[in-house]
């Protein structure tokens, strides 16, 4: 849930066991046929933002902050919020999605561009910088649309997926924790109380994202930063929908 990723000393201790992406024999998914995506707002276009579906047409969009299914238990985005990214992330996300598609997997997007006002609201709800990044006078990470929160899923086959793991005809992979988990198990390279299967799935996600030049934030296995995400920029005035 970070925007400017907060310092978390415990995250560093979890980096010892860094596993390589495991081989997979899953049947590749067909390349999706692009569908017409409504243009982003004039403000978003001027800021260099694009709808992620224009570069990852099979993206599964599950923006948690557009619902109450998030750590604040409050709906922070309008229901029609879109996953918008800065165009500097587009090529990298396409590369990652292409690699995962060959393994029968798709990317599920939990958060993308996050308005500054929402970051302020988050910190007001949970004023703990170990959990939520303290807002500043500059836009970084999610606030600059250069970070995404993601997981992996594959197409559901029959009744093989637990109901809690289903999302839009897909089944999410076991990653060891859910989104916005505030325990040490959420650290990207955690091994304690994280199954071998979940560690392998995290490694698979990291490897694919790394091929696109997108790197994990070690404090949260789901948070990935694009080029220049940590550079402070003017705060955007862009609607999330």
Where are these regions (language model features)?
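Extracytoplasmic cell-surface/polysaccharide-interacting catalytic and binding patches
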Residues: 2, 7-12, 16-110, 124-219, ...
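Short, well-ordered surface patches within globular domains
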Residues: 118-119
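Segments that shape or occlude catalytic/ligand-binding pockets
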Residues: 115
């Amino acid at each position: 849930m970070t925007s400017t990723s907060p310092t978390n000393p415990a995250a560093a201790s979890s980096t010892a066991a860094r596993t390589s992406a495991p081989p997979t024999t899953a049947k590749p998914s067909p390349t999706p046929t692009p569908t017409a995506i409504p243009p982003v707002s004039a403000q978003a276009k001027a800021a260099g933002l694009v709808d992620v579906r224009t570069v990852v047409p099979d993206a599964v969009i599950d923006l948690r902050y557009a619902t109450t299914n998030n750590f604040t238990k409050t709906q922070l985005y309008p229901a029609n919020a879109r996953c918008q990214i800065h165009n500097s992330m587009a090529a990298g996300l396409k590369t990652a999605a292409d690699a995962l598609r060959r393994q029968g997997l798709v990317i599920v997007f939990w958060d993308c561009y996050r308005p500054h006002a929402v970051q302020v609201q988050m910190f007001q709800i949970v004023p703990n910088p170990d959990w939520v990044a303290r807002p500043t006078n500059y836009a970084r990470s999610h606030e600059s649309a250069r970070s995404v929160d993601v997981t992996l899923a594959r197409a559901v086959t029959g009744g093989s997926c637990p109901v809690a793991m289903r999302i839009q005809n897909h089944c999410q992979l076991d990653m060891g924790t859910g989104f916005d988990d505030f325990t040490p198990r959420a650290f990207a390279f955690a091994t304690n109380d994280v199954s071998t299967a979940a560690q392998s799935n995290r490694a698979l996600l990291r490897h694919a994202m790394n091929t696109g030049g997108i790197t994990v934030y070690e404090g949260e296995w789901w948070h990935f930063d694009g080029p220049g995400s940590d550079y402070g920029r003017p705060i955007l005035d862009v609607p999330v929908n």
